């Protein structure tokens, strides 16, 4: 069976950038990696209702900077910035060596075309016992109205309470997964239903992006 590579990982260094921007030696690399994972899981769980699309982590010396992409920045910031200060205080228990934590909030302008937020929206509807077909089709229709080139959704698990788990796909438009210059956004979420977990995947094609050409200077020996 053909398997799908992660669309973001395939395009890193071509048209996509890293979600973690730091360098560490062999001694500290694994600690930083685990710490990054713990930070992402904690922030996602703490402000899940704010619609967190992604979290970029930058490290430099004793400083850790988080770029949190969210559909509802007001929920993360809180009244007078109280939400961010509370988040910083709790993150200090996760981050080692008393590092200085900086939080930058970036607003996601169009939640209807963000793959991660779309997947979470479908998962939330499944938890409310809404039909998976209806949830998937409505999400696709809203996204296509926003002017994207294509979208595909997949739901896996005991759909509709069936005894045998299966996967169902719906798509509209084009999804060129193998074209590296194609800007493919990918999102994954899980719905906890009474029949067990249902996995939701969303692929969004936003058009082609031409990678920036590096200028090659030719040295002419006189």
From Swiss-Prot:
Q: Which Gene3D superfamilies match?
A: 3.30.300.20, Ribosomal protein S3, C-terminal domain
User: Per UniProt, which keywords does this protein have?
Assistant: Ribonucleoprotein, Ribosomal protein, RNA-binding, rRNA-binding
Its GO biological process annotations read:
translation
Return the GO cellular component terms, semicolon-separated.
cytosolic small ribosomal subunit
Q: Recorded GO terms, molecular function? A: mRNA binding; rRNA binding; structural constituent of ribosome
Domain (KH type-2) ranges: 39-109
> Which InterPro entries is this protein grouped with?
KH_dom, KH_dom-like_a/b, KH_dom_type_2, KH_sf_prok-type, Ribosomal_S3_C_sf, Ribosomal_uS3_bac-typ, Ribosomal_uS3_C, Ribosomal_uS3_CS
| SUPFAM superfamilies for this protein | Prokaryotic type KH domain (KH-domain type II), Ribosomal protein S3 C-terminal domain
Pfam family, any one = KH_2
Quote the subunit structure annotation: Part of the 30S ribosomal subunit. Forms a tight complex with proteins S10 and S14.
- Family the UniProt entry places it in: Belongs to the universal ribosomal protein uS3 family.
Biological function: Binds the lower part of the 30S subunit head. Binds mRNA in the 70S ribosome, positioning it for translation.
Q: What is this protein called?
A: Small ribosomal subunit protein uS3
UniProt lineage: Bacteria, Bacillati, Bacillota, Clostridia, Eubacteriales
